[in-house]
Amino acid sequence: MNWRGKKVLVTGAGGFIGSHLTERLVELGGDTRALVHYNALGTWGWLDESPVRNEIEVVAGDVSDRDSMLKAMDGRGIVFHLAALIGIPYSYHAPASYIRTNVEGTLNVLQAARENNLEMVVHTSTSEVYGTARYVPIDEEHRLQGQSPYSASKIGADKIAEAFHLSYQLPVVTVRPFNTFGPRQSF
């Protein structure tokens, strides 16, 4: 795909995968807006040290806030939705936070995309939705298993994305990365 001049939004742009994607879209000529989670320090996560920092339009907001999403998507054509609470262990202590960000946040992204007539939503899920492998290699027919509040929240987000595609014909693609690693990863 030719990204030159494409108006894209990346949610979760300050994180591990989101920061790399944001940089690559800029390198490919995309008109890239990056949504980073608001914080009192005004930092942009991994984008603070990005070599293309000055070529990115950064907006602070929160996917769990509908108005943030409507503003962030204004004038965009494609959204890459990577914003999420991650980390399985903490999800056992704060499951409501995971539902709020991962499920309700995804709902806000999808509703804003629909209201702004976006061309496409690329929704980022996780291999964790499959739980313990029932067979290998795992494929898309593998049963979904919510083995933690985190994985259950991502299953919920995936199903809402699917519903928006089937109910409203919103062009949605769901990707489920496995074992991502590299510079900037969290440990």
Question: Model segments located where?
Answer:
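N-terminal Rossmann-like NAD(P)+-binding domain of SDR-like oxidoreductases, especially those catalyzing
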Residues: M1-P183
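ATP-dependent carboxylate-amine ligase catalytic core
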Residues: F187
